[in-house]
Amino acid sequence: MGMRPPAGLPSLSKRSRVLLVLALVVAALLLVGPRLISTYTDWLWFGEVGFRGVFTTVLITRLLLFLVVGVVVGGIVWLALLLAYRSRPVFVPVSGPNDPVARYRTTVMTRLRLFGLAIPIAVGLLAGLIAQSSWVTVQLFVNGGAFGVADPEFGLDVGFYTFDLPFYRFVLNWLFVAVLLAFFASLVTHYIFGGLKLAGRGGALTNAARVQLAVLAGTFILLKAVAYWFDRYSLLSSSRKEPTFTGGSYTDMNAVLQAKLILLAIAVICAGAFFAAIFLRDLRIPAMATALLVLSSILVGAVWPLVVEQFSVRPNAADKESAYIERNIAATRQAYGITDDKVEYQDYQGYGTKPPRDVPADVMTIENTRLLDPNILSRTFTQQQQLKNFYGFPPTLDIDRYDIDGQLRDYIVAARELSSKSLTGNQTDWINKHTVYTHGNGLVAAPANRVNAAAGESAEEAANSNSGYPVYMVSDIASQEAGNQVIPVQQPRIYYGEVIADTDADYAIVGGSGGSDPREYDTDTSRYTYTGSGGVPIGNWFNRLAFAAKYTERNILFSGAIGSDSKIIYNRDPRDRVTHVAPWLTADGDSYPAVVDGKVVWIVDAYTTLQDYPYAQRSSLDGLVEDSIDQNTGRLLPRKEVSYIRNSVKATVDAYDGTVKLYQVDQNDPVLDAWMGVFPDAVQPADSIPDELRAHFRYPEDLFKVQREMLAKYHVDDPKEFFTNNAFWSVPSDPTIDTSANQPPYYVLVGDPETGKPSFNLTSAMVGYSREFLSAYLSVKSDPENYGKFTVLQLPTDTQTQGPQQTQNSMISDPRVASERTLLERSNKIQYGNLLTLPIADGGILYVEPMYTERSSTGPNTSTFPQLSRVLVSYREPPPSNSVRVGYAPTLAQALDQVFGAGTGSVATAPSAEEGTPPETGTTPPVDQGAAPAPTAPATPPSGTDVSAAVAELDASLDALTSAQRSGDFAAYGAALARVQKAVAAYEAIPK
């Protein structure tokens, strides 16, 4: 009786096949359609900003990678399937009516061409999609050059490790994938068509199956041998000793390196054993070779290095690792730009030897001491300079400097931007939101060392006066028309900015048909039509359809507000625009506005980075730059591991037309050279930077924070001392907040010790490792002539100079501060501003901290915002006293006179509202424009009796105030309060 052939899979009806095809088409459109629309709109956008060459280069590179890797991987799999099918046995015995393989064999045979092509094509498509994302690796390999620095182990140029080795790894990994997939495809094919039988005790292989599988297995192991060879070079970025140091350690160089060579030799032997199986039927030889490779990988590759580490290195770690730590120190300094030619170390005693008024640089420092904190005053700017509810300022303002009337001063600056989140009521209608409220209005600046008037002497006067506010200089539409701009701006309209872009759909539609009335809000009495070059034309129906689909907004398609000359403005965040046109750069977390040649431009710092610079310390960018400001704003660099960073590019984004320009500022960066080879016209050379723009360049905060973390460890030269951590520094915690976040660095305008002229520096205090005393002071210059020059003041290891946290504690615990704080907190919220650390008095350290008060809200419609009420200063006296003197007064001048004696504070900038525009406070009463307080009388040394009596009276008055409050006697309470104020004033009147 004949055996019934196995049944195939049930066939689909014609209707089912049609529905299946339609479903596949719809799915493809849903998957591919958005990508095509995004590609088309990106093509339009890159053309608008003049960087279409970047778009096409990246696109072509991705397509070529997709095709090459897809064809190679898919082709190898297809060839393996073809060979396995063609070498199948002629007669395939069926094991029985329930043979499961026969069922699948019949299915494959009925759709042979489908399976033979669909599988390789699917594999190739998937491989190509994954591989195309590695376009950066390929372009750096093609365009990368030499660093001119050789590694200490193999003597190869660093460029090999950063440009070549990643590409070789990329190729090797895809060959691994292709061979492995081909092996499994061959295995399954031979099994289905009878070349491989699993029935019986040992199974069976046909000669063809044995040869094909042996060749593929041998090739895979041969590739593994090549991988062992490249693994040797990867040891120079080993993480075995992290976080102590990155790079090859003693164990890596004396155990793992040799193990890689041994395993390489064993892998070659093992591959030879598999190739021998082509001629020998006995598979025990390749099986034993495989077992040898696995066993060797465990014993030689893992156990041996572990033994060396545990029994040779750990008992003598400082000596064994010394040479490798030395390599790490040298490489890290090179990779992070903190080599000795860029960093000047100076010994600094920590206490002064001269009166500040006798040091020319100190006079300049005191005159420009910053009292306004850009991290606190955003709400003050908003309340006094917002003008309309739909304008706004960023939560953290910026600092820049301007030369006005021959005087260089630092200013708190912010663009008055459109805030879409603040639109209310009918303002949120699509027409209004996207075609009427389209732009901001002007730049607002305030001298950082000045307020409109000093706060009152008593706590009650300080809390209720209209003093302590910024002195504004406004460059907007109104001031332009009036012709009274201190900082002249020709085009004050802001179409691109940080606040504008702080919404999901940040687009604006500008322009219209010829002759149409202006639509965009400009002022209460005027409307405006955009005339800039920015924006993508959407006057034609095809572009309107594309953007309607992009934003899923039908109004773009049907709105009558869109005419033949209309354009759509989007990607309005300056940082996003820079990273779009230069995807190979990492943008700094903060962009800042500056007026250059009469235009408001955003300046964005951009970095080139590498992940595996040999022996350089590897760190996470987001972890290094996070501080108390970033925790509040969420302004962080991406989560990215780096071991090399350079601020090689400064970018500008025009606030009116969105024009992006990239400038080369580091001509010795091989990474930037490579990218300039990829995109020849993207970055403009350094000599094309206008001098007016260069004058506004700041040393970037994020780079400085990365470098200060490195300098905290890598200022140490001795590798053995490095290993013990004894000489390390730490970034101090921010004493003005409750969390333990790092204190941010601060921009300050100080006197240059060599010239006495003002110098714009970025600075940070450093404390000892797990200590609070000050250990070092870092500063880096932003002046064009000395840009990027580091100065590190190193204090003695036994210093008694207080660090920021100790200084804060000593200042707020001072009796004058503590007593008045108690009074102020009854009806005010107190905020301490940036605690500045300033070298002064030829060896001393002066701390300056503004104190802001904000009245507690008394009603639902009452607006409150911070105002400068007091200034605290702290200074350590020279030995043998070493005592810490604290100044506390409404003005910096008075506080300095309390510490240094009369006359020192006379050079400080007095409160005044003469310069700039008075604040527009809305419902707030006008600010008192009165003159600055008269200078204090010359100080005389206080007697112990005077101080004791004043303190005793202060304590007694506070006790009386507490008793009166408990008794509920309002008359007694008023008398007690007056007594406290009188006691505080008497204490403050005592010369300190």
From Swiss-Prot:
Membrane topology: Multi-pass membrane protein
Pfam families: UPF0182
Keywords associated with the record: Cell membrane, Membrane, Transmembrane, Transmembrane helix
Listed InterPro entries: UPF0182 (IPR005372)
Ranges of compositional bias, category Low complexity: 908-934
Record has Transmembrane helix as a keyword: yes
Subcellular location: Cell membrane
Region (Disordered): 904-948
Residue spans crossing the bilayer: 18-38, 63-83, 114-134, 174-194, 211-231, 260-280, 288-308
Gene Ontology annotations for the cellular component aspect, listed alphabetically: extracellular region; plasma membrane
Similarity field: Belongs to the UPF0182 family.
HAMAP family for this protein: UPF0182
Protein name: UPF0182 protein RHA1_ro06389
Organism: Rhodococcus jostii (strain RHA1)
Source species taxonomy: Bacteria, Bacillati, Actinomycetota, Actinomycetes, Mycobacteriales
